[in-house]
Every structure is written in C-alpha cells, then in structure tokens.
Regions:
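N-terminal, charge-rich interaction modules
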Residues: 1-52
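Short, flexible, solvent-exposed loop/turn segments with mixed acidic/basic and small polar residues
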Residues: 1-2, 57-63, 88-90
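Helix-rich interaction surfaces within compact, conserved domain-sized segments
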Residues: 6, 17-20, 75, 80-120
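Short, structured motif recognition centered on aromatic/hydrophobic residues
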Residues: 6-10, 65-72, 83
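Short, low-complexity, polar/charged sequence segments that are solvent-exposed and flexible
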Residues: 26-30, 51-55, 89-92, 117-120
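Glycine-rich loops and low-complexity Gly/Arg-rich segments
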Residues: 31-35, 56-61, 94-98
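Short, intrinsically disordered low-complexity segments
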Residues: 40-71
C-alpha cells in the first residue's frame, strides 16, 4: 500500500476538532490529506499516492456527499486502533463513515466508497 501512513479526510470543518485530529496524526507521523469535492471521482489509490494509479481526467457531472468520512491508508492495525481510541479519549465526536484502504477499494472512487459505507 502507501509507503507512509496517510488518512484521507472528507467534509471536515476548519474547527478545533479538525485541528486536534491533524495535531494527533502529525504527532504519530501520519499524513492527513483533505479531499475536496472535485477529487471525489478520483480513484482512492490515486488520492493515496499509490504507484500505478493515474488521475481520472474524464468529465463527471454531479456526485457529492456532505458527511464526514475517513479513509486510513497504510496504517498498521495498532495505528488505526490508537487513532480511533484518540476520538474517545479526547471526547471528540466520532466519524461514522470510516474505512481502511484495501486492494479492492483502492480502485473505487470516493463516491462509491461512500455508498458502500452507507449501506453497511
């Protein structure tokens, strides 16, 4: 997967909670990348910086969601457990939609992952 652990974030407000999340990830040497709406059609593997993935240059109309979502890329099980525990320990509202980047979903775009997570 990714060489350096990375968390993709969607629809986070520029507030104190987001600042605390960024600070925690930085302390743990995990990168944080906010994904913007125009990038929602890009393959998750591309957004995570995986080799072999290219930017989707085709035109897409529509497609958006407004809920927060996290995609953890290249985190060890221990890193992901500690990250999720951080929300509880700090009393932060949890993120309902979260996933690990996998060999299957790395080919999906953010909208497809969102739809799959909403179904679960």
């Amino acid at each position: 997967m990714t060489e350096k652990p990375l968390v993709l974030g969607y629809n986070f407000k520029p507030d104190e909670r987001t600042r605390l999340i960024r600070r925690y990830l930085n302390k743990e040497k995990i990168s944080f990348r906010m994904v913007e709406v125009p990038e929602f059609w890009q393959p998750l593997g591309y957004l995570a910086g995986l080799s072999g993935f290219q930017k989707d240059t085709s035109f897409h109309l529509g497609g958006n969601f407004f809920e927060e979502m996290l995609v953890m890329c290249g985190l060890s099980p221990d890193q992901s457990d500690r990250f999720l525990r951080f929300f509880r320990e700090e009393g932060l509202d949890p993120v309902a939609l979260k996933a690990m980047l996998t060999p299957v979903n790395q080919h999906w775009n953010s909208l497809k992952l969102y739809e799959e997570l909403k179904r679960e």
